[in-house]
Structure formats: C-alpha cells, structure tokens
From Swiss-Prot:
EC numbers: 4.1.1.23
Organism: Carboxydothermus hydrogenoformans (strain ATCC BAA-161 / DSM 6008 / Z-2901)
Similarity field: Belongs to the OMP decarboxylase family. Type 1 subfamily.
CDD domains in UniProt: OMP_decarboxylase_like
PANTHER family: OROTIDINE 5'-PHOSPHATE DECARBOXYLASE (PTHR32119:SF2)
Keywords from the UniProt entry: Decarboxylase, Lyase, Pyrimidine biosynthesis
Highest taxon listed in the record's lineage: Bacteria
Name of protein: Orotidine 5'-phosphate decarboxylase
Amino acid sequence: MSERLIVALDVSDKEKAMDIVEELKDVVSFFKVGMELFYREGPKLIDDLKNLGLKVFLDLKLHDIPNTVARALKNLIDLEVDMVNIHALGGKEMLRAAYLVKDEALKRKGKAPIILGVTVLTSMNQESLEQVGFKIKLSQLVAILAKETKEAGLDGVVASAQEVALIKSICGTEFITVTPGIRRFEDANFDQKRVLTPKKALELGADYLVVGRPIIAASNRRLAAQKYLEEMEGVLHGSL
C-alpha cells in the first residue's frame, strides 16, 4: 500500500528534502521530485534517493517539440527513475516520440519507467480553461488527452481523481491514473481546485495518490503520512 502513496518533495533544496525522506522512509517508499528541487539539485539527488531503495517520480512535465522531448526523456530514463511525465497537450507526435524512447530503453536495458501524460493541472478548473481559450468542458478535454496518451502507447495519465472513472471507462482499468489534489477532510486545499479525499479517489479507481503539503508541512510528518495510509488501507479492506 505504501507504494500507492507518493509524497511530493515540494521543497527548495536537498537538505530539506532529505529531512523529509529520513522521517518518512520507513512508512513511505515513493517520492516525487519536481522542477524546483530537481533544477537546483540535479541528478545527484535522484541517485541519493535510489541508493536508499526508494522509488522516484520525476515530475518535470516535459513539453516541447517531439525530438527535444525524446532526447530529454532518454536522459531522464538513464537516471533510473520509476515514473516520469510529459504534457499530453504536446500532441500525438510528441507522445509517440516518448513511447519510442521507452520502447528503445526496454530493448536496451530490459526496463523503463512508467511514462505518463499530464492532462489538466489540478490547480485549474473550468473557468481557468476558458480564460486561456478552451471552449469545451474540462472533463471532455481530459478524456481527449487521456485517449491520445493511450493511443500513443504510454502507460497512463496524471489527472484529478474527479476524472478517474471517466478515464478508466475510456482507456480501460489497466491504464494508470496518478492523482494529485488529494486531501483528507481536515486538510487545507492550498492552491488546488479539483480535490478529493484518499477514500473517494481509491473508490473511483485511482492507482497512485500524490500528496505534498498536508504531509510535508505537518508538525509530525510520519503521523500525517500514516493517517493517509490508514484511510487508503480502510478502503481496500472495506473498513471505511
């Protein structure tokens, strides 16, 4: 169960990140490294996390022309990360280029990370989409992007848990959904707009839950993580 909870290391430097990891590594085995931390600390941080036997989701949301994304992704795969993402809005050619890089890595190394397409950020809502010119419903856009990601051969998507059931109905239950914007009832939403509880997210079929500030900003991070894990365990064992 601990592998289905991904704790986001949304901090500015390695010292802060490793403090969090040291406190949580006995209860959580999967950590997300985003732009802020990776751009400061670089690949050495990934090595340090992997040397502790931990899983790493490298959340850089690549978005560029297909050739550039393919070359960048090859370098990220060589870091031995377990999960990486690219923006699905980059289009079919970019998504397919990413798939081909993964396929080459599988042939060359016998393994490759989970590669995800990012649909619509959980900090956005319908109004946010309309402000940048989208005239369709948010859920329709998510469905289109998820379908294109699957057709390109990638493993799954990053999306709000609110869209998980829709995504699974279109792409199948084996298509992976990684869901940020997860909050227990007593937690603040911060800048997230499309949020759900761990219980509801799992009931809808989410495969991985990403949680940042409610855990890493808690006075007792280990206890906060355990509360999330207990709620998740309760759903899977029918006690909630």
